[in-house]
């Protein structure tokens, strides 16, 4: 969709919360706030840590081991990417490959930066094959560092699903990462992601920024959901009587209720998955045009990416895939399937392929 026609002001009030508008035009592959791990990696890494190393963390019980960093065991290798909210590095920790995320202290929105840091820790202590695990974290930083906190995460892989979908012909990665997504591969990755969502929702955690750029693909070809800087705990949201807290994310993947400023539910992640599955299937960008117009049309006119392509209409399998995607991005959250039901439907669909 290149242009969206929206009635002028005065015809009808905007269904969007005023605070949801973006401050500037962004590409659909970029977040509406920069809490996500950066997509673009610089060619050269600068000096990684400044000043002296913080004191070695005291011994902690195993169940609290993630809550402190043994700085003597950190060996930084190179920068993976950087953005307004910080930098991500590849490193080793106790000899094991990891990714280290440092959240900047001096940013345009310090409070949002702090929220992003603590949101990343919503999954601390949790383990699942399709979730990037938090290994350790600390608010202690080197004395001269510009960081308000450091998070050590499982190294989920060098490649994101976004790169596989859009950069296949230009990627310098091995051939195994550059081949096109077959229907079987698309369903395999989809089940990986849904399995991760099912686990998160069982732990009362909402991701709220699910998109291909936040899905890593490991060397074992397993998808892992990453970047929890926009995540929320469900019990916290349910306990709020007033307006919900500000939720970041990516406007192209946000459910209508999120764009309207309503309190999030697990069905918001299901909507985001529907857009992601559409991207895997078509290898196209969801929307183009002014973000605020797209947001308005998604809410007021039920705008969605096109399902008219031959990939959806030329075969029975395509039509079945079309039905799954449509069910995920229904306007009302109650009409969307749960992660459990979606997992069952995807497994049944994969079974029909033989």
Swiss-Prot record:
Protein kinase domain segment(s): 74-350
Q: What enzyme class is recorded for this protein?
A: transferase
Give the positions the UniProt entry annotates as the active site.
209 (proton acceptor)
Q: What PROSITE patterns does this protein's entry cite?
A: PROTEIN_KINASE_ATP, PROTEIN_KINASE_DOM, PROTEIN_KINASE_ST
Xref: Gene3D superfamilies: Phosphorylase Kinase, domain 1 (3.30.200.20), Transferase(Phosphotransferase) domain 1 (1.10.510.10)
InterPro entries referenced in this protein's UniProt entry, alphabetically: Kinase-like_dom_sf (IPR011009), Prot_kinase_dom (IPR000719), Protein_kinase_ATP_BS (IPR017441), Ser/Thr_kinase_AS (IPR008271), Ser/Thr_Kinases-Pseudokinases (IPR051681)
Q: Which family does it belong to?
A: Belongs to the protein kinase superfamily. Ser/Thr protein kinase family.
Q: What is this protein called?
A: Serine/threonine-protein kinase-transforming protein mos
Q: From what organism does this protein derive?
A: Moloney murine sarcoma virus (strain ts110)
Protein's gene: V-MOS
């Amino acid at each position: 969709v290149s242009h969206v026609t929206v009635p002028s002001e005065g015809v009808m009030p905007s269904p969007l919360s005023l605070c949801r508008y973006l401050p500037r035009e962004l590409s659909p592959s970029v977040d509406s706030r920069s809490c996500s791990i950066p997509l673009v990696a610089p060619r050269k890494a600068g000096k990684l840590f400044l000043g002296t190393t913080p004191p070695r963390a005291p011994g902690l019980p195993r169940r609290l081991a993630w809550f402190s960093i043994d700085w003597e065991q950190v060996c930084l290798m190179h920068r993976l990417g950087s953005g307004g909210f910080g930098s991500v590095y590849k490193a080793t920790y106790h000899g094991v490959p990891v990714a280290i995320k440092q959240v900047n202290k001096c940013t345009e929105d310090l409070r949002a930066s702090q929220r992003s840091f603590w949101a990343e820790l919503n999954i601390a202590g949790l383990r699942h094959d399709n979730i990037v695990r938090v290994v350790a974290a600390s608010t202690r930083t080197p004395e001269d560092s510009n960081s308000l906190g450091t998070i050590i995460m499982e190294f989920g892989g060098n490649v994101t699903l976004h790169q596989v979908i859009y950069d296949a012909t230009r990627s310098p990665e091995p051939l195994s990462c550059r081949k096109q997504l077959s229907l079987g591969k698309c369903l395999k990755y989809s089940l990986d992601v849904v399995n991760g969502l099912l686990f998160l929702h069982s732990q009362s955690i909402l991701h709220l920024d699910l998109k291909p750029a936040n899905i890593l693909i490991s060397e074992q070809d397993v998808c892992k959901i990453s970047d929890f800087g926009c995540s929320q705990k469900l019990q916290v949201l349910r306990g709020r009587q007033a307006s919900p807290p500000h939720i970041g994310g990516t406007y192209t993947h946000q459910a209508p209720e999120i764009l309207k400023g309503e309190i999030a539910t697990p069905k918001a992640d299901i909507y985001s998955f529907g857009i992601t599955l559409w991207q895997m299937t078509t290898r196209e960008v969801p929307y183009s045009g002014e973000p605020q117009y797209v947001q308005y049309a998604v809410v007021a006119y039920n705008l969605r990416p096109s399902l008219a392509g031959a990939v959806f209409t030329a075969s029975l399998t395509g039509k079945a895939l079309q039905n799954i995607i449509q069910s995920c991005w229904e306007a009302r959250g109650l009409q969307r399937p749960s992660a459990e039901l979606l997992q069952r439907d995807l497994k049944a669909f994969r079974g029909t392929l033989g």
